[in-house]
């Protein structure tokens, strides 16, 4: 393997899909939020992305079967906009800038073929505050204002590291719209509380009620 490789498991019928990305990073906030979405909607896997830029190890599942590091794509049929959810257990090394651009471009290439024109990335930001917050970065002032009305705070305190920010910015260059939802975290451990906060905010934005019993204690710890 000398370049990213996309494997399709099935070909779902999607109408006006919205792309939602949640990857590991500060506090694993994005990945935790994505896993909660997948659980809530009982989302079905339909594609996997592999890359030689991912770490040189394999993961072992509960029955002892190994697989390469990968990004996983899931789909959710909905009345208004279908969801395409992507998550994974890794990102390219932060020192490998070219790899980040290549992988994020590959992701955007794929979701464009699915008909996605709006993207939502989720992640964590290392800000210590007494009150947990969801911050917003967007591709336009209009979108930033819309999500502020939903309760988010404009993020103007620095950079968004890794795929959480890069996917959003590269999508903007292709005339796609989108936002990044950022949960505050210390970043020293898997922050299930911050992940659940971002998940809950997104569910509210989608107009969905959270099932009873689905809380931060149901979020993955890794």
Predicted regions and their residues:
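N-terminal short beta-loop-beta anion/metal-coordinating cradle
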Residues: 1-90
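Conserved active-site and cofactor/substrate-binding residues in soluble primary-metabolism enzymes
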Residues: 28-32, 98-102, 106, 162, ...
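Long, Lys/Arg- and hydrophobic-enriched amphipathic alpha-helices
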Residues: 24, 32-35, 187-222
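Catalytic cores of processing enzymes, dominated by hydrolases/peptidases
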Residues: 126-205
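Secondary-structure boundary elements
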Residues: 105-119, 172-177, 204-210
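A generic structural motif
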Residues: 90-94, 185-187
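Hydrophobic/aromatic beta-strand patches that form the interior of the parallel beta-sheet core
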Residues: 47, 84-86, 118-120, 177-182
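Internal, conserved structured core segments that host functional sites
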Residues: 94-142
